Regions:
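ABC-type ATPase nucleotide-binding domains, specifically the catalytic core motifs of the NBD
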Residues: 14-15, 89, 93-110, 121-122
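Conserved ABC transporter NBD signature motif
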Residues: 60-72
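Conserved ABC ATPase "signature" region
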Residues: 107-127, 179-180
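The feature captures the beta-strand-to-loop junction immediately N-terminal to the Walker
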Residues: 37-39
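Conserved ABC ATPase signature
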Residues: 132-136, 140
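Helix-to-loop junction immediately C-terminal to a conserved catalytic motif
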Residues: 52
Length: 261
């Protein structure tokens, strides 16, 4: 059994008969970096919220490491696009909040040192510890939002368009940071990453899944070896990469045309 198992999953909101997701089946192995693509409104974020335990399936089942995915858990780190920092707390205090849940017996000094180390791990200086979110740039806020999710060392990381609101330069830096954090670990985390951006998926993922229009199910997926995954510098030079890029775009747009017609 994989790290994440989705069986015959369907979902509708509040008793609404209109399904958002229909008959989703997916097995994600430990250490995979899976990117989910699809048009706006197809249910990508809804699927992530279901995996996070923030919503419950209408029918079907979700298992995380063999256990039903009901409610929040320290085994799942979740990062959203809107930073998710408490504005009245300093950056370091936001991280401490997560650390105290994971390590309730550690003393304050040890927890603070861990929080500083997590800030440094996401490319921020120790001085950021004492800054409030309003004092930080968008890129710094998002790094701070990723730090609490990583600080509790969850085996599974769920990310919902975490870089979608950032400028191109900051986005590229954080993409590289995330990939380096994921690929540099002896025991790689399982990452489930929602994005609209085909190029972002190609840069980060070793598996890409495309959802169709609502009611969504999986209409296409592919795996990328380390050799197939492009670098930022070579992504437009590799013919196979460009073929795959065009196919992903075709699959997404094909389903839109089908629903319009």
């Amino acid at each position: 059994m994989g790290d994440i198992t989705v069986k015959n999953l369907s979902f509708s909101y509040g008793g609404d008969e209109r399904l958002i997701l229909k008959d989703i089946n997916m097995e994600i192995e430990a250490g995979e970096f899976v990117c989910i693509l699809g048009q706006s409104g197809c249910g990508k974020s809804t699927l992530l919220r279901l995996l996070a335990g923030l919503e419950q399936p209408t029918t079907g089942e979700i298992l995380m490491q063999g256990v039903s995915a009901e409610g929040a858990s320290l085994d799942k780190g979740v990062v959203f696009q809107d930073y998710g920092l408490f504005p009245w707390m300093k950056a370091g205090e936001n991280i401490l909040l997560a650390l105290r849940q994971r390590f309730p017996k550690k003393d304050k000094k040890e927890l603070k040192q861990t929080a500083v180390e997590m800030l440094e791990a996401v490319g921020l200086s120790a001085s950021v510890y004492n800054k409030f979110p309003k004092e930080l740039s968008g890129g710094m806020k998002q790094r701070c939002a990723i730090a609490p999710a990583l600080s509790v060392d969850p085996p599974i990381l769920l990310m919902d368009e975490p870089f979608g609101a950032l400028d191109a330069v900051t986005r590229a830096r954080l993409q590289d940071m995330l990939f380096d954090l994921w690929s540099g670990q002896a025991s790689q985390k399982t990452v489930f990453f929602v994005t609209h951006d085909v190029d972002e998926a190609l840069l980060l993922a070793n598996r890409i899944v495309v959802l169709g229009q609502s009611p969504s199910n999986i209409i296409y997926e592919c795996k990328l070896s380390d050799e197939q995954r492009p670098t930022r510098e070579t992504r437009f030079d590799n013919l196979e990469t460009m073929k795959l890029r065009n196919e992903l775009i075709r699959q997404i747009n094909k389903d839109v045309v089908t629903h319009i017609s």
